[in-house]
Amino acid sequence: MATVITSIGSKSAPDDTVDGPLTMGSASGSGTPWTGTVTFGSAPTANIGDKLYFEDVYYPGSFGGCDGGGTADVVYLITGISGDGLTLTVKYISGALSTTNPYTISSNSVCSVIAQPYIVRFYSTMETWETGLDDDDLYADGDIAKGECYADTSFSSTWGFTINSGNGLSSGHLDATYLVAAESQRHDGIANTGVRILAASGLTSVTIVLHHAIPAVPIHRSFEWIEIDMNADNNCNTGSETIKHYGGGNWDYSSVASHCIIHNTMGSRTKPTSAAFSMSSNYSCAHNNIIYNLTADDCGWGASENTNIWALYQVGNGGQFYNNTVYRLYITTGTGEAIGIADTTTTAHFYNNLIVDCEDGDFGTMGGSVTLYNNLSSDSTATGTDAITGKSAASLFVSTTPGSEDLGLKSGAAALRAGKDLGTGVTIGGDVFASSTTCTSPINFDIDNRDRDAQGDDWDIGADQCDTCYAYNFAPAFLLFLDN
């Protein structure tokens, strides 16, 4: 089993590159497909998961001569980078003979002039990454597919996409699919500071579906460190259900959405129940997310539409919500409800969630056997062990100024040091959820990537762990005593 990383971003063609054209110094390797190293005189800009890409080239033929006709596009996957950056480890993917050494690829018809490659992203969109999950040239049975997104520009989406591929390999199926922001491209807990999906103008529905087929493979799916900005476009022709967990079952096949920012979304008459996170699969998990400015509008159709907007909506069994921050849900017009957490399950787990300023209740009516620990609300609806109620957004967050929201905690916030310590995962029935076995950033990492567990922190409630904040709104006094 291997983890196969591929990059995703707009710098995916010779007219918009990560780097290049480049002059190679040498290449050494073997095998089918060819794998080896390519060395350059000066270090190219490259990332693991990018392509080494040759456009309109020739390559040595099987029986001598020069094939390709000057129209071959040859692709190698970058799998390693030397410490000095001068040498790339690559694997042949497509476009020539599978045994082709990149240093033998040429720009002329007699294969006498060494071609100059480019460094580009492997995929241009998240959708094409998803489609490629059944590519036998990239993956083998038991592999983990990790798509790493780059903020070359904002990703644009018209409707979203479903992640349900990875079970069609000729050798079998993937064990997991992780769609994440590359580590250097992560947001810092504030909108427009990292990888972002921006809804296309005129739309209010960007739905990312984490889906498990029957039989349930791949086993784990995750969506992490990505902002979804619905563009504050109140279009009454569509609705929004932003991240939907669908078709899961138990630990053996679960899905995770974590470290995301979702904001400025709207539900409307065409989707009367809209949610930032909709859990219709069992044992799925949302942790360390920030959600704010969600609204619903009946668009003039009256009480018969009853349009609702919810931040965290659980309709399966065993759903898990840990260390999420939710702020400001409201109804624009109509008779629907705006609720932070809505639950209709027989079993669910809610730990360390900070939910404030939801027009019709921060926490809705809980059904069945629901476990609640250390949750916080601005009204009186947070219940369960060590719940905190009646705390205003102004007392909790750095900024709630529209367009400049910073939902990190500030000194004096009641959420500071008031959370339940969840370690590096939550054990339920002998299985460990929200851990490194189900996602790339487990529950102990906050929205700023602080490792609460490794740092020995007393946990805060919500997505942000503020290590520089004082639990009371003043700094410790510094006293100097002088002995005369």
Model-derived features: positions:
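Acidic glycine-/aspartate-rich tracts in secreted/extracellular proteins
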Residues: 44, 57-59, 82-84, 93-97, ...
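Predominantly extracellular beta-rich ligand-binding scaffolds that present long acidic/polar faces
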Residues: 239-245, 251, 259-412, 425
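Low-complexity, Pro/Thr/Ser/Gly/Ala-rich linker/spacer regions in secreted
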Residues: 114-118, 465-476
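Small/polar beta-strand repeat architecture
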Residues: 2-48, 55-128
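N-terminal extracellular ligand-recognition/capping segment immediately after the signal peptide
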Residues: 141-175, 182-186
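Viral virion structural and adsorption modules
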Residues: 1-10, 470-484
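Right-handed parallel beta-helix/beta-spiral solenoid domain characteristic of secreted/periplasmic
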Residues: 106-112, 168-236, 389-398
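C-terminal accessory segments
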Residues: 388-468
